[in-house]
């Protein structure tokens, strides 16, 4: 049992015993709200799945989720009046706990387009092209347990950055050629960095650049955010010619998350929130270069 709050519980459900309670929530969300045909909402996998119910303080079902034998998360549903209370996050985390207990190396899911950021914050990475399921736009997402998932494009790289910022305790590190246009100027990434930087307590975002002039000339939107929070953000530019030729770009946090793009001018690579060996290596490399690089005093507001 995992609690989502003082008046909410997440409990394992038995499909045969709890079928009606599971169906009531799922029909309300998928069939009536999202107009999914009833015959598509129920499938042959249902009796074989591990199911969860979210119960309110009076024991009434308000949310569902399931883990299928093909290692896929699905049927994530929370009744409309109960959204925004962390119930979806609690259901998802409980399924990840169960997947780890079973020793699964990876789980996947089909995310509706509007829910991509929700799953990204939990460490899921988009993969493959968008597709339609029951007439609704979806994209497949995966999460390694532990380890890194393949990153195929800018949306997947952004998803990893959202997760790194969301899981970080006190620190983020970014190594970039010139603030990665198409990635570090995305609104969802900027919002994630702002949320991290403005959380209570001491926070630090360190950014190493190979070219500090280009972001300033192009008006990179991360710079005004950093200038409003000078106690959090610090920028340095590499000086050593060897560092200037380093081909990769990467990010790491202080909880074992990492994103590594072998060719920094491309978005593809690997990343995840549970990749401690890579995160440690990247942090050590970052510290060495940081110490021999120059502070970007030109970024400060006069």
Model regions: which residues?
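Conserved catalytic-core motifs of GNAT/GCN5-like acyltransferases
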Residues: 108-110, 125-140
């Amino acid at each position: 049992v995992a609690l989502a709050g003082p008046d909410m519980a997440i409990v394992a459900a038995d499909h045969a015993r709890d079928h009606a309670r599971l169906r009531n929530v799922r029909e309300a969300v998928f069939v009536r709200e999202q107009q999914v045909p009833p015959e598509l909402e129920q499938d042959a996998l249902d009796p074989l799945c591990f199911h969860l119910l979210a119960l309110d303080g009076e024991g009434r079902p308000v949310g569902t989720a399931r883990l299928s034998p093909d290692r896929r998360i699905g049927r994530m549903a929370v009744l409309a009046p109960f959204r925004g209370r962390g119930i979806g996050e609690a259901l998802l985390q409980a399924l990840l706990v169960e997947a780890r207990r079973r020793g699964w190396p990876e789980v996947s899911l089909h995310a509706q387009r509007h829910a991509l950021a929700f799953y990204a914050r939990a460490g899921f990475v988009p993969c493959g092209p968008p597709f339609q399921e029951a007439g609704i736009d979806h994209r497949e997402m995966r999460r390694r347990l532990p380890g890194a998932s393949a990153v195929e494009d800018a949306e997947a790289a952004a998803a990893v950055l959202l997760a790194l910022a969301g899981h970080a305790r006190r620190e983020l590190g970014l190594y970039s050629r010139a603030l990665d246009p198409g990635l570090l100027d995305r609104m969802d990434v900027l919002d994630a960095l702002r949320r991290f930087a403005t959380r209570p307590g001491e926070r630090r975002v360190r950014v190493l650049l190979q070219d500090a002039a280009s972001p300033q000339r192009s008006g990179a939107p991360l710079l005004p955010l950093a200038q409003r929070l000078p106690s959090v953000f610090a920028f340095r530019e590499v000086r050593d010619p060897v560092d200037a030729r380093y081909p990769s770009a990467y990010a790491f946090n202080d909880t074992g998350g990492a994103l590594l793009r072998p060719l920094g001018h491309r978005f593809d690579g690997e990343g995840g929130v549970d990749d401690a060996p890579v995160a440690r290596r990247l942090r050590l490399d970052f510290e060495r270069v940081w110490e021999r690089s120059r502070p970007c005093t030109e970024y400060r507001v006069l």
